[in-house]
Amino acid sequence: MRVVVLSGAGISAESDVPTFRDDKNGLWARFDPYQLSSTQGWQRNPERVWGWYLWRHYLVANVKPNDGHRAIAAWQEQIEVSVITQNVDDLHERAGSTPVHHLHGSLFKFHCARCNVAYTGALPDMPEPVLEVDPPVCYCGGLIRPAIVWFGEPLPDEPWRRAVEATETTDVMVVVGTSAIVYPAAGLPELALSRGAVVIEVNPEPTPLTKNATISIRETASQALPGLLQRLPALLK
């Protein structure tokens, strides 16, 4: 049996991964997300964009995978499982999943905004949250930026290609913790259904996918995923 997992913000929320509006220190809540997550915002103030992403980078580095992440990693030891995520954290990887196809980039990867070469050098320290941080500079003179898909940017070719390939050939797709409204990722469950796959939605709240999903489970990732593989035969009867 081949399984694809499509994960969204809900699974990471259980690990207390902060969102934009979760800013406890008050530095970022006053900014429009577009100012910090777009090429226009980057061009206007790269130091502020770096401050925002470096703050998130270090916050996420200090949280841990939850039972949902660990369950998915355990599945990979038993059956063929492809992990596709809209999240920019590394919690799937730290739980043991591999490979993980990041559709929206990663807080833990960086590249030059000018020549696109990957950056593996040191990051600025952030012992306390600050509003602006000088970006590292590439050998070509360009500024290093987070490898995140910003507003208006296309998805990275390779992760998207692999996500589509896995979706087209899967037997079961588990859609966990995603609102199912952000395209093109929201189109993957539709593609799976069109190819005859079973689509299982795991979300405490209904989403636009609910009416079309084969099965909808109104639980969180940590509640539903640890026992889901064993429950599949009964669920699919």
From Swiss-Prot:
Substrate binds at residues 53, 56. It catalyses: N(6)-acetyl-L-lysyl-[protein] + NAD(+) + H2O = 2''-O-acetyl-ADP-D-ribose + nicotinamide + L-lysyl-[protein]; N(6)-succinyl-L-lysyl-[protein] + NAD(+) + H2O = 2''-O-succinyl-ADP-D-ribose + nicotinamide + L-lysyl-[protein]. PANTHER family: NAD-DEPENDENT PROTEIN DEACYLASE (PTHR11085:SF4), NAD-DEPENDENT PROTEIN DEACYLASE SIRTUIN-5, MITOCHONDRIAL-RELATED (PTHR11085). The gene is cobB. This is NAD-dependent protein deacylase. GO terms for cellular component: cytoplasm. It is an enzyme of class 2 (transferase). One of its GO terms (molecular function) is protein-succinyllysine desuccinylase activity. It is found in: Cytoplasm. The lineage of its organism: Bacteria, Bacillati, Actinomycetota, Actinomycetes, Mycobacteriales. The keyword Iron-sulfur does not apply. Keywords: Cytoplasm, Metal-binding, NAD, Transferase, Zinc. CDD domains: SIRT5_Af1_CobB (cd01412).
